[in-house]
Amino acid sequence: MKEQKWIHEGLITESLPNGMFWVRLDNEDPILGYVSGRIRRSSIRILPGDRVKIEVSRYDSTRGRIIYRLRNKDSND
């Protein structure tokens, strides 16, 4: 049976080595996030201040996988 995961939105607050980030979720919980393989292969840049979607396991709610970088509303592209 496949493990159930929750998907949350949050804000990148700090960048760490090896594709790890501190993410502040919309409910103000800090969580340690790592970049998914699809984002890593696509060379998508994630910087502090970006909004992301993060997938969190029900068994370990302190870590999550960043699965999508949301577009900024004020960008010109």
UniProtKB/Swiss-Prot annotation:
SMART domains, per database record: S1 (SM00316)
PROSITE patterns assigned: S1_IF1_TYPE (PS50832)
Database matches in Gene3D superfamilies: Nucleic acid-binding proteins
Domain of life, per lineage: Eukaryota
GO cellular component, one term: chloroplast
Family statement drawn from the similarity comment of this UniProt entry: Belongs to the IF-1 family.
Quaternary context: Component of the 30S ribosomal translation pre-initiation complex which assembles on the 30S ribosome in the order IF-2 and IF-3, IF-1 and N-formylmethionyl-tRNA(fMet); mRNA recruitment can occur at any time during PIC assembly.
Protein name: Translation initiation factor IF-1, chloroplastic
Species per Swiss-Prot/TrEMBL record: Spinacia oleracea
Gene it is expressed from: infA
